[in-house]
């Protein structure tokens, strides 16, 4: 039986003879050999680890500095103990590594390196420091359809390239679209290929559901088979949200989402007054991408030739005020709950990690900003009081704000904000009884 490292090396063509990878300090290599560490573990000495950027069910993502190049990178650290006996998740890890190494595009996060210890796998990728897509939009003084076109063109270009390689991302959403740096003209990159799939051929289909509710295509949920068109649907949802600040779908369950998609002639509605100053071309663009039958959706290449993309008649009026109404509350709620969930996941991982043999400390907690939680609590109190005044029902405006959240984030932050604040700050375990379709890797089912 080959070792896990041998399986990865042969499967993903990692060149273990690369001098930069293995010609490390001879003392470090000798110590690693004595301690039973894999040969590639010597590469860890080339990195200084920084803050934790995120955490899932099987590990964390941390910022790091590569000493040999002085380059900042992101390192996904996965616990082998958490993956042990889970062949599906191991296969997903191998597929993510394989896909990342095959892709090379300016709008796709780039693969840098991988290595392993006795207890963990390390995947090193480009670090995008410019912030998430919607966060940057909120910081602007002006946002027009022209700006939206520039964003969607970059996303479409990346998806067109992926699809040419028969790769389906399956989790396109604003949180996975990042700016490379903080410069005004920074390019965007698509990140998180954790549930991406390599198709065997042009017409190959996947039959197991995975994705994020609110952005996932209907055919993924019905498990009738999905392929490249599911990414096009997600682009349609991103475009809609980009131009008005709220999600087109407010359902908090799979059943509710499917009902929303099929209740009317079109799966989405362009509400007044939010869409009054938006061009007819972009509405047509969105409706094309959101066709219920995946076979009827245009390809990424065809969308790049759409009149909204190529026309010089795109609206230039400032739509930022309306967009901010939807983005602002969404950001406050999501930021607070993600910090709470991050620390809780890290605690669970640390408990598992403490049983390992590695001497390094790769998993650390982040601090929760108390003022952030205060602001969210007040926003929720206002929302709750206004709802009570209207007989327990949210207004249309409040429903739009709520629709900007995923089911899990909204449910969990309401719970957190209504509990004793100090318990929340202490990282009390959250109730995971209700989950979205895509909660990191726990609910990702694969072939």
Swiss-Prot record:
The active site is at residue 171. ATP binds at residues 53-61, 76. Residues 323-334 are annotated as: Calmodulin-binding. It holds the Pfam family Pkinase. The modification Phosphoserine is found at residues 354, 367, 371, 387, 443. GO terms for biological process: cellular response to oxidative stress; signal transduction. Keywords: ATP-binding, Calmodulin-binding, Kinase, Nucleotide-binding, Phosphoprotein, Serine/threonine-protein kinase, Transferase. CDD domains: STKc_CAMK (cd05117). SUPFAM superfamilies: Protein kinase-like (PK-like). InterPro entries: Kinase-like_dom_sf, Prot_kinase_dom, Protein_kinase_ATP_BS, Ser/Thr_kinase_AS. Multimeric. Present with 7500 molecules/cell in log phase SD medium. This is Calcium/calmodulin-dependent protein kinase II.
